[in-house]
């Protein structure tokens, strides 16, 4: 009986020691790279879905080089020629199938959940890209991009639900 009592006390003490630490919370880190499509062909103002012009094709290749050392897990693009063509060089280089999204109906929380612990490239437009970034960071920080500006890179990192962001600008000395 004395042995059983000692054994129970020992098990109880070991149990208390095992409960000393609070459970560890797994770190989650998701990084999103937002860009606007590269320069589009403006030769036909009636064309609502133009392709990229020569400079835009160069910039699309430039983005692929900039993102070369980033282990991109997913690429999203709107369903337009200019955004698809901007995403294509990076998608080919990384062997990733581009997924399409509708900026008007995307569920931001679901998008975050679907891409937890991933590095994601998102290609959008002058109005949708800053809006998407604002929704991801939970504040109205960025305004619509000027229609002639195609070199902004917004990086949003979400660590354990807390978002940080930065906007970088890249020049492209691509031929016209």
Enumerate the predicted regions with their spans.
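Bacterial N-terminal signal peptides that target proteins for export
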Residues: 1-8
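Short, linear, compositionally biased motifs with a strong N-terminal bias
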Residues: 10-13
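C-terminal motif of bacterial Sec signal peptides marking the signal peptidase cleavage site
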Residues: 15-18
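Active-site-proximal alpha-helix that buttresses catalytic centers in soluble enzyme cores
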Residues: 21-24, 28-113, 129-132, 139-153, ...
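A structural signal for alpha-helix termini and helix-coil/disorder junctions
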Residues: 3, 138-139
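Generic beta-sheet signal
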Residues: 32, 116-124
């Amino acid at each position: 009986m004395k042995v059983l009592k000692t054994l129970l006390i020992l098990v109880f003490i070991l149990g208390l020691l095992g409960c000393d630490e609070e459970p560890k919370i797994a770190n989650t880190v998701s990084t999103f790279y937002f860009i606007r499509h590269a320069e589009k062909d403006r030769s036909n103002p009636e064309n609502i879905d133009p392709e990229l012009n020569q400079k835009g094709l160069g910039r699309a290749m430039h983005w692929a080089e900039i993102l070369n050392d980033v282990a991109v897990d997913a690429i999203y693009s709107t369903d337009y020629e200019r955004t698809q063509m901007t995403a294509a060089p990076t998608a080919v280089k990384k062997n990733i199938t581009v997924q399409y999204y509708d900026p008007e109906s995307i569920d931001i929380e679901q998008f975050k959940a679907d891409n937890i612990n991933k590095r994601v490239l998102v290609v959008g437009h002058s109005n949708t890209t800053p809006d998407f970034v604002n929704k991801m960071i939970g504040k109205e920080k960025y305004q619509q991009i000027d229609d002639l500006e195609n070199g902004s890179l917004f990086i949003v990192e979400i660590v354990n639900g807390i978002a940080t962001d930065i906007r970088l600008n890249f020049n492209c000395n691509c031929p016209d």
